[in-house]
Amino acid sequence: MKKGNKTVWNECIDILDNVKSPSFSANFDDYFKKSKSKPPKKNKKVLNNIKKAELKLKKKANKKQKANTLYIPPFAQQAKGIVITINKMWKNVHNDDSKQEISILSDVSLQIAYGEIVIILGSSGSGKTTLLNLIGGYDSISLGSCIVANCPLEKCTSEQLLTYRKNNLGYVYQRYNLIELLSAYDNIAISQNLIPKYQRRLDIEELAEKLDIKEILYKFPYEMSGGQKQRVAIARAIIKEPKLLLCDEPTGALDSNSAENIINLLQTINKTYKQTILMVTHDVSLTRIANRIIKISDGKIVSNQLVRPLV
C-alpha cells in the first residue's frame, strides 16, 4: 500500500478503533456499494485498499480465535441510574530518567449518573485527558477499579475493550478526525455500520437535519468550515446511540461563534437523546451547561460538584 493510502487506512483505525474486530468487515462491502456520495474516481483505488487491509486483519484475527467466539466483556452490577463508578483508581507510568514509577492520576473515586453533562476542568498536564482515556478504555488502569455501563474495565482484555468501546462509546476529538476522502454522509455511515441493522434507530438524514448539517451532507471535509466539521464529527459519534459521549476539547480548534454553536448543540443532544456527556476542557465558560463540574490538579480530583441536579 502506498504512503498516501496507508495514511487513509490509519485514519480509519484511529476513528473507528474497531477494525481488529471481525464484526467490522461484515457490512464493509455493502457500505461502499450503498454509499450515497461519489468521491473522485482516483480515490476508488484508495478505498479498495482500505477494504483489502481490513480483510487481511479479519483473516489474521480469525486465526487467533475459535470460530464464532465473541469477546464479551465481564459484567459488574452498578447502582441503578449510574453509568460510571470509579473507586481508588491510579495510573502510574515508568520514568526513564529516575527509573521509577510516577503517578499521573492518583486515588480517583467518583460516580456519574446517566444523563449528566460532566465538565472536567484542569490545566495542561493535570491528568484530565488521562482520566478520559481510562474511562474510554484507551489506557490501562494501574490500581483500583473503573466500571462503565456495568463493564469493569480493569478486568477486560484488549479484545473485550474493543467490544466495550463499540457498544458503549462515542468520541469527539478537538481536530474532528474526519476521513478526508469520504463525504459527511459516509463519515457518519461508516460509524453506523459498526452496529447491526436491527439495532439502528437513528436515520442519518433525520439526524443531519436536527444537527443543522443536512446542506453539507454530501460535501467533503475540505469543503467545510471548522464548526461544520465538528458537527459532522458529533453526528458520527452519536449515530450509534452510545451510552457515553466523550469529548476532548471539542471547541478548542474553533472560533468563538462556532464554539458557542457547538456548546448549544451538545446541550440540545443531552436533552433530546438523554445523552451522558463527559467533556474535558480548560475553557471555564463551558461549565454553564454542566450538571457536574470536576476539577483536576496534579493528577488528583480537587473538586467534584453537582451544580445542577438531574430533574
Curated annotation (Swiss-Prot):
Binding site for ATP: 122-129
InterPro entries per UniProt: AAA+_ATPase, ABC_transporter-like_ATP-bd, ABC_transporter-like_CS, MacB-like_ATP-bd, P-loop_NTPase
SMART domains in UniProt: AAA
UniProt-listed PROSITE patterns: ABC_TRANSPORTER_1 (PS00211), ABC_TRANSPORTER_2 (PS50893)
SUPFAM superfamilies, sorted: P-loop containing nucleoside triphosphate hydrolases (SSF52540)
UniProt keywords, alphabetically: ATP-binding, Nucleotide-binding, Transport
GO MF: ATP binding; ATP hydrolysis activity
UniProt name for this protein: Putative ABC transporter ATP-binding protein MG467
